[in-house]
Amino acid sequence: RYSALPRMLLSVWMLPRTDAAKRAAVSSGGQEGAALRLSTLAEDGQLGRGALPRAVGETMTDLLENGCACVPALALDESGLLLERGCGVLVHGGLAGWLEGDAARGMELLEGQGTGTVELSGGRAVEVTEVRLRWTPEADGGRVTGAGLVCRLTARLEEGAAAPEKEELEGLERELAARSEGCIRAALDSLQSRNADCLSLTRRLAALRPMARADRERFGTWELTAEVRAEVTRGE
């Protein structure tokens, strides 16, 4: 008996329209086989070092329950090598747009991802090792009107880096927090401009405030605030 289950478990990526030469490079393997490259990207996502891979079934469920879905996107370089390109926002009518750059980084953080190396000023770099999120819904008149997010980042200086003084360490924490907060803000603004609740906030906030009604259609009008707190420790 035919079963669609294996197909529903396959990971899905989005790739923008590109020229024939680049498509041919991918078909011939490029610098490395497409299958191997996709496997590497999926593994990085599972380890929190990139966009979390999405299965076909998960994507379809998000479209049914949220009216939208955020799917990891890829781009091709001149040789046909597949590179991460943020994510695409799908709605029932098709592609609503892309999250790239800061917005893509913000989306990773909003999904509890985003671990890995972050370059900071002064030639410093930190490795984000943990991302924790806490949403607090806001309601008025029995209806959810917004939410506040507190995102806590734990990071450490890269191994071999000179130990900083306390004042410099605190400065790195402020810089990491401010930069990450800007990325989260960019992602939230992009999603709200499309009224695309790819974070399932409607259902999550309804569970946190069961006496208040959370309308998915009003997601774009909610007041969403974000605060990032970072803790940076000295590398061993």
Question: PLM features: what roles do these ranges have?
Answer:
Residues 1-236:
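A glycine-rich, acidic short-motif signal
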